[in-house]
């Protein structure tokens, strides 16, 4: 019934198994991949023909984690997996980026990749395995795909590169780098690092590329016995059309792209496009080509013209040379009632970034396959349509916004103080108000400025820059701080963020083969120069964190209480802690280890809550004087509440220096009195004295010390 084919290899010390022919047989390609004991199912389905009028390649990648994979039931009211989590969205993008360039130009059939995590051993992250399984499924499917690709994670522990480190090893690693590519070339890099040099980062990329070669060999071996017949796809040849269009439009397009003003340049290009359309769609004559074909070829021609201009003249669309960064204006404190804010403008790219400080109860709970954890640093990136002068949908963030926000998050996180050093939850929101290239890197710069403005003690300021690379035969040009128009025409786009001491995040997408290690090294070092320049411009606004928090930011005081006292502070059903919060106005968060965080914008509220909690958990000291309230009187003395919920007896002989006949002659219930703790009797009962304390001042009466001790 089943025609099963399997290939197994040992990879980075663990078995990797790829199997096809048993599961999901109606998909064009399906592979069950196992690494250690983590299992994913990758499927590929591609329509047999494109939709009429389709002018782009509709590729969708859906990565999904099933909670049963880790023996869990979804949390929340509905016990079913819902909308994609942030990780699912990010891994979907991670798989998409290296496979998209390997589909032939002109292939426009609707294609969907679905990757499902069906078992997780809590040791091997499913993202790398998902990339490998997708590559195998595409290679077997018969869909035109110029793969296979491999992928690997690289760690850097104790000065050594580690291939596919276990999840628990990543805590010790100063690098988390994912690299994917073919046998000959690197196609994609995504990473977070703790201030590593360009050489170490590039070394990690090449180490990973070498590391996944056995995986590519295994996929090829499986394809030799299990691959379907390749589909007959011949991309349309538009070389004659392109040559004809070039003869009409080359001169005017070159002139248009010498215009350094974006709006004027766009108008000039539109005029050339109108001229081209008039040539190919004469009135009263049946056109030889469709509007979609003319549009696609014209777009291709635009890219060629810009590339030729840059390589020939070493001058960019906006008049800059290859390494110049656009003019930068950095401002902080632009929204004075917020906790921290900045406005970062680089050319026609601009971001308003706002930092908000919160308490422990503001932390984000994340329910992952590996377990529930709390995230104390949140970064949200918003890209409204007006930022590029367009109308569009507004609503929940798309994949691009989530991906850009995560890149900025990775860039800044290594410089944040620990929770012990700075016990605040941090939320940063980046509102992109203008965009013409590299809004994610503007977010990195703006986030660094806003956090420093808020008084967050960053180890160092962080800046980011977007780079491009154009290569024609042996000639190449590396572009610093690319424009939106330059973003898609390059052969390598990469974004580098870091401090003056090293790289904290690197994202790289390479679209062609032939980008050598030497070329990447040149590009990374040019990016370093740009990053240092941007850091210098940012320092004109603020160069280090403010010494104090903003006026409207909450203050947090941390105290530690014995673990066995936590129950007393919380009270039955939370009664005590609710009362403290209601009466003092402070927010209180108690950790399982006895760490108590008290937060309020008012120092008085914090102090009131701290004293209250201290009175509950602390033990009264013998010989100390306390203020108390008489709660009960008796013939033999008065009971005084003097230390939180603690009561003690003032014997009738200790009420006053003279002889007292009746307790009520000296005190009544509700009276405020000063008492000294004399000690405890043999049954542990508290012994108090009023007569040794001046009831007007609360000071001890020295002359009476000996009497009280009797």
From Swiss-Prot:
<dbReference type="InterPro" id="IPR001247">
    <property type="entry name" value="ExoRNase_PH_dom1"/>
</dbReference>
<dbReference type="Pfam" id="PF01138">
    <property type="entry name" value="RNase_PH"/>
</dbReference>
<comment type="similarity">
    <text>Belongs to the polyribonucleotide nucleotidyltransferase family.</text>
</comment>
<protein>
    <recommendedName>
        <fullName>Polyribonucleotide nucleotidyltransferase</fullName>
        <ecNumber>2.7.7.8</ecNumber>
    </recommendedName>
</protein>
<dbReference type="InterPro" id="IPR036345">
    <property type="entry name" value="ExoRNase_PH_dom2_sf"/>
</dbReference>
<feature type="domain" description="KH">
    <location>
        <begin position="554"/>
        <end position="613"/>
    </location>
</feature>
<keyword id="KW-0694">RNA-binding</keyword>
<dbReference type="Pfam" id="PF00013">
    <property type="entry name" value="KH_1"/>
</dbReference>
<feature type="domain" description="S1 motif">
    <location>
        <begin position="623"/>
        <end position="691"/>
    </location>
</feature>
<dbReference type="InterPro" id="IPR036456">
    <property type="entry name" value="PNPase_PH_RNA-bd_sf"/>
</dbReference>
<dbReference type="InterPro" id="IPR012162">
    <property type="entry name" value="PNPase"/>
</dbReference>
<dbReference type="GO" id="GO:0003723">
    <property type="term" value="F:RNA binding"/>
</dbReference>
<feature type="binding site">
    <location>
        <position position="493"/>
    </location>
    <ligand>
        <name>Mg(2+)</name>
    </ligand>
</feature>
<dbReference type="GO" id="GO:0006396">
    <property type="term" value="P:RNA processing"/>
</dbReference>
<dbReference type="InterPro" id="IPR036612">
    <property type="entry name" value="KH_dom_type_1_sf"/>
</dbReference>
<dbReference type="InterPro" id="IPR020568">
    <property type="entry name" value="Ribosomal_Su5_D2-typ_SF"/>
</dbReference>
<dbReference type="InterPro" id="IPR015848">
    <property type="entry name" value="PNPase_PH_RNA-bd_bac/org-type"/>
</dbReference>
<dbReference type="GO" id="GO:0000175">
    <property type="term" value="F:3'-5'-RNA exonuclease activity"/>
</dbReference>
<dbReference type="InterPro" id="IPR015847">
    <property type="entry name" value="ExoRNase_PH_dom2"/>
</dbReference>
<dbReference type="InterPro" id="IPR027408">
    <property type="entry name" value="PNPase/RNase_PH_dom_sf"/>
</dbReference>
<keyword id="KW-0548">Nucleotidyltransferase</keyword>
<dbReference type="GO" id="GO:0000287">
    <property type="term" value="F:magnesium ion binding"/>
</dbReference>
<dbReference type="GO" id="GO:0005829">
    <property type="term" value="C:cytosol"/>
</dbReference>
<dbReference type="Pfam" id="PF03725">
    <property type="entry name" value="RNase_PH_C"/>
</dbReference>
<keyword id="KW-0479">Metal-binding</keyword>
<dbReference type="InterPro" id="IPR004087">
    <property type="entry name" value="KH_dom"/>
</dbReference>
<dbReference type="GO" id="GO:0006402">
    <property type="term" value="P:mRNA catabolic process"/>
</dbReference>
<comment type="function">
    <text>Involved in mRNA degradation. Catalyzes the phosphorolysis of single-stranded polyribonucleotides processively in the 3'- to 5'-direction.</text>
</comment>
<keyword id="KW-0963">Cytoplasm</keyword>
<dbReference type="InterPro" id="IPR003029">
    <property type="entry name" value="S1_domain"/>
</dbReference>
<dbReference type="InterPro" id="IPR004088">
    <property type="entry name" value="KH_dom_type_1"/>
</dbReference>
<keyword id="KW-0808">Transferase</keyword>
<dbReference type="InterPro" id="IPR012340">
    <property type="entry name" value="NA-bd_OB-fold"/>
</dbReference>
<dbReference type="Pfam" id="PF00575">
    <property type="entry name" value="S1"/>
</dbReference>
<dbReference type="Pfam" id="PF03726">
    <property type="entry name" value="PNPase"/>
</dbReference>
<keyword id="KW-0460">Magnesium</keyword>
<dbReference type="GO" id="GO:0004654">
    <property type="term" value="F:polyribonucleotide nucleotidyltransferase activity"/>
</dbReference>
<feature type="binding site">
    <location>
        <position position="487"/>
    </location>
    <ligand>
        <name>Mg(2+)</name>
    </ligand>
</feature>
